Amino acid sequence: CLSKKFEVAEFAGLRSSGCVTFSNKESSFFDVVSAQLTPKTTRSTPVKGETVAKLKVAINGFGRIGRNFLRCWHGRKDSPLDVVVVNDSGGVKNASHLLKYDSMLGTFKADVKIVDNETISVDGKHIKVVSSRDPLKLPWAELGIDIVIEGTGVFVDGPGAGKHIQAGAKKVIITAPAKGADIPTYVVGVNEQDYSHEVADIISNASCTTNCLAPFVKVMDEELGIVKGTMTTTHSYTGDQRLLDASHRDLRRARAAALNIVPTSTGAAKAVSLVLPQLKGKLNGIALRVPTPNVSVVDLVVNVAKKGITAEDVNAAFRKAADGPLKGVLAVCDEPLVSVDFRCSDVSSTIDSSLTMVMGDDMVKVVAWYDNEWGYSQRVVDLAHLVANNWPGSCSTRKWRSHWMSFARQILLMRNAKSMNNRFCYVSSFEMDDFRSQ
């Protein structure tokens, strides 16, 4: 049932890489004109419809998310990103081997080679490998890095992630919940429309669990009105746990990950309010780490304002969203599947429709699966594409927007005055509100 949902989507992953530009379904006149006329930042021959050169990307931390990100990016068509360097403490030997051979993803169907002691290649594309635990010592300025994918899980606050900016990078995307109210959080499918290039140089993609939870919570709140609720994520173990009993600041995580169900904390439910502010104080939750290496499942129970609903009503709302505004982010599964069936699922969350329940007239239980590595990494790529598509060209975005809005107004005024005199192509079906809304 999953394959039916992985079609061409606004936020598309490896199975649907034909549309990854976050283009609106209804293009305004400005969108059409500027796409053709905004100058490129390179010296190459201009190509119709191409707006800017590819942005140079560095991956800091070549672990689970870093390598998943590179695989996801490699599978995208016409990506506006160019991964040019990874920072990995293991050097080229570890970077190339672990990228090529993965216990969860299998062998990478790309030609991965070691070029020299500081370079690997992926299908002939050279990627530099550096090794430094101090972001201030990384060669971001020298390499002209535009975006750093911060995947270590260490530099998640302003001062830490800000070291990449000091080293010469222009933007940082943290692949974890950010610490500090000064770093905005974006969840693709929920609040990515709030992003603009000028807002912040450091942004967060939230956690994998928040990316699973927020899309369907948004649907429930819009359709049913969430009063309050609790969440439990049954989560695969991660590298933050111990393989065998050993010291850890969290005494439960100190216990052997492959032998135990480990209750622990998660900020995922509370973090939903960062992208859906109206839900602040309404959700909370815990995590149960279990002896599986990948794929997790969220169990949400909420009280809702709307009365007299059925499980079918709830699932119908999810199906509508999955086929509409959340296509490529949310899916609905009607088959009796288990966790392994959701490995390499591109979407952020898949509703298990048979497990949806309604108790009384206002309590709803929803279960949703997610690949906490692959699905999350697809959203990191999507967010990086969003950043790239909002990147200013050789002239500032604001200057070009003002220029072309002025140009469009002149056309409309001349059309309305019937004084075109064949100097411009006739423009129809556009009103001034179309431009004011841009």
Swiss-Prot record:
Its domain of life reads: Eukaryota
Q: In which pathway does it act?
A: Carbohydrate biosynthesis; Calvin cycle
Q: Which residues form the active site?
A: 208
A Pfam family (short name) is Gp_dh_C
Its annotated compartments are:
Plastid, Chloroplast
Q: Which Gene3D superfamilies match?
A: Dihydrodipicolinate Reductase, domain 2, NAD(P)-binding Rossmann-like Domain
The UniProt keyword set, sorted, is: Calvin cycle, Chloroplast, NADP, Oxidoreductase, Plastid, Transit peptide
Query: So what family is this one in?
Result: Belongs to the glyceraldehyde-3-phosphate dehydrogenase family.
What protein is this chain from?
Answer: Glyceraldehyde-3-phosphate dehydrogenase B, chloroplastic
Q: Which organism is it from?
A: Nicotiana tabacum
| Lineage per the UniProt record | Eukaryota, Viridiplantae, Streptophyta, Embryophyta, Tracheophyta
Q: Which gene encodes it?
A: GAPB
